[in-house]
Amino acid sequence: MTSDDDNELMGRARKGDLDGIGILFERYHGSLVGFFRRVDGRGKIGEDLAQETFWRIVRYRKSFDGRRPFRAWMFQIARNVMNDHLRKSMRAGKVMDPRVELNEELAAQPDSDVSAEVERGERKELLREALSRLPLEKRELIVLCRFEELPYAEIAPMFGCSVGALKVRLFRALKELKEVFIQLGGEKTA
C-alpha cells in the first residue's frame, strides 16, 4: 500500500467511482479507530468517529488534492471530526472517563496471567490518563507521530508549521507526557 495507490483511488472517487473509497475504508478504518481511541480515550466512540470521517471523505472527495498524500488529508479530516465531537460533548456537558473501557477490556480477556495483565493494565491506564491530561493538539501530535507513524512531512501541514518546528513541538509534547506519567505514577505508589 503506497500513497500513490491511495491517491489513485481518491482520484477515481473524485470522478464518481466510489469503490475506491470502500478499499480505503478497509485499509484505514483500524488506524482511524485507534487514532480516536488514543486521542479521546474511549474505544466505542472511535468507531462512530471513524465512520463520520469516511462520510466526510465521501462528501468532500472533490476537494482532495492529489499532490498531498491521502493519509495526511484523511487525518486532517479526522482531526476536524474530533474537534467537532469535543465541542459537542462540552456543550452537552458529557464527561469522558477512559477507565471504564479499560476495565471492560481486562474483563474480556480469558485465561490470562491476572497479575501480569493487571500490571500491564495499570501502566496502560497511567499512559492513557497522562495522555488525556495533555492539551488536544499535543495528544493529536503524539498519536499521529508515535502511534500512527505518519511522516513528519505529512503531519507538519496539519499543524501549520515546518518539519523542524513539528519536531520541536513533538519533543516538548513527549517531555510533558513523560512528566505527567511520572507524576501519576508517583501518586499511585505513594
Regions found by a protein language model. Give the residues of each.
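Amphipathic, Lys/Arg- and hydrophobic-enriched alpha-helical face
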Residues: 25-43, 60, 131, 176, ...
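DNA-recognition helix of helix-turn-helix
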Residues: 79, 83, 87, 126, ...
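Sigma70-family region 2
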Residues: 14-15, 38-41, 52-69, 88-90
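Structural recognition of an alpha-helix C-terminal capping motif at a helix-to-coil junction
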Residues: 48-55, 68-80
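Short amphipathic alpha-helical boundary/capping segments
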Residues: 8-12, 126-134
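Arg/Lys-rich amphipathic alpha helix in sigma70-family domain 2
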Residues: 59-66, 76-97, 120
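Short, charged helix-capping/linker segments at alpha-helix termini
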Residues: 2, 14-23, 33-52, 163, ...
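Internal acidic/polar
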Residues: 2-3, 92-120
